[in-house]
UniProtKB/Swiss-Prot annotation:
EC number: 4.2.3.3
Active site: D71
SMART domains membership: MGS
UniProt gene name: mgsA
Residues annotated to bind substrate: H19, K23, T45, G46, T47, T48, S65, G66, H98
Keyword Lyase attached: yes
Protein's recorded name: Methylglyoxal synthase
Length: 152
């Protein structure tokens, strides 16, 4: 597939997601980085978003809870280029009933080439990168070209 570029602006649209057993870790991480996150637009799946907003005072756009369709909503926002990066604290030791949704979410994040952190260490690296606070060009699928080829 051919690619084109997309600009992630200095004010990022960040998805915050956590499996149930990791919500406390994500909350602690978010509290630690509250000032760095404040200028950005934050999205989260339902339960996580409500917890983060209540406990940190940050403005969070809460979607549905992950198992109720929130992972799919988030995937749609990524495909529409409305999410720039994702912090997803997931639990590799416990299966979740919505694992297929999680796999689909990770696949879409990979297809659209957004930065993804899957634990505290990788989230720290993303947030402290010099690229975090500046405009960044990333390669993304050339959907228009893809569509033209398919319809030719």
């Amino acid at each position: 597939m051919h690619t084109t570029t997309r600009t992630l602006t200095q004010h990022k649209r960040i998805a915050l997601v956590a499996h149930d057993s990791c919500k406390k870790n994500l909350l602690n991480w978010t509290q630690k980085h509250k000032e760095a996150l404040k200028p950005h637009i934050l999205y989260a799946t339902g339960t996580t978003g409500h917890i983060l907003e209540r406990e940190t005072g940050l403005s969070i756009q809460s979607l549905l809870s992950g198992p109720m369709g929130g992972d799919q909503q988030l995937g749609g926002l990524i495909a529409e280029k409305k999410i720039d990066m994702m912090i997803f604290f997931w639990d590799p030791m416990n299966a979740a009933p919505h694992d297929p949704d999680v796999k689909a979410l990770m696949r879409i994040a990979t297809v659209w080439n957004i930065p993804v952190a899957i634990n505290q260490s990788s989230a720290d690296f993303l947030l402290t990168s010099v690229l975090f606070e500046q405009d960044v060009e990333i390669d993304v699928p050339d959907y228009e070209g893809y569509l033209k080829e398919r319809l030719a």
